C-alpha cells in the first residue's frame, strides 16, 4: 500500500500519473460524505489550495506537489489530494464511524481514526486531525500546545503533538483582528522520531480559498 501511494506522490511531482497508475486512474470516493452538496453550502467549511511536501523514503529525500480540497461539516471531514493535472490520487475521510483512506485501484482502507490509518497504510501520517483546528489558527483542544503570537495576537507558531505549525502568511482582506484573521499559508514540520515517526516530514499549504 505504501508503494501505491508513493507512486501517486511521484505522479504529483512528475505529472505522469497516467503512466504510473495504469490508465489515468483517479480515485472516486466509495462513500462521499458530501455527495449532493453545493460549493456554496454555508454548513460546509471548505479550504482549497496547493500543497508541497518533503519526506524521506528509503533513506532518500523525496518531494511532491499538487492541489488539495478540504471539506468539513460537524464531525465529517474529507481531504482530497490531486495531481497538477487534476486527477484525484488520494481521499481521506473521517466521521463518527471512523476513518477511510482511498487510493487508486485499491479497496478502501478503514480504521478508527485518520492518523493511525495513514501511518499503518502509508508509512507516515499527515496531521489530518490537527489540521481541523490549525487551519483555524488555534491549537487542538485536549493535548498540550505551545503557542507563540505576533504583535496582533495571531499565532506565529503552534507546537503540538510532535508538529510545529508556522503561520507564514495571512489573507489580506482588510481585517487583521485575531478573531477574523484567515490563514493564507502555513508550513508544518515534524522531526524524525516525533511520535514514533520514522522520518522527518515537511508540508506547505497555500490556501486559495
From Swiss-Prot:
One Gene Ontology CC term in the entry: cell outer membrane
InterPro entries per record: LolA/LolB/LppX, OM_lipoprot_LolB
Pfam families assigned: LolB
Coiled-coil residue spans: none
Lipidation (S-diacylglycerol cysteine): 18
Record text on subunit structure and interactions: Monomer.
Record's protein name: Outer-membrane lipoprotein LolB
Organism whose genome encodes this protein: Ralstonia nicotianae (strain ATCC BAA-1114 / GMI1000) (Ralstonia solanacearum)
Native organism taxonomy: Bacteria, Pseudomonadati, Pseudomonadota, Betaproteobacteria, Burkholderiales
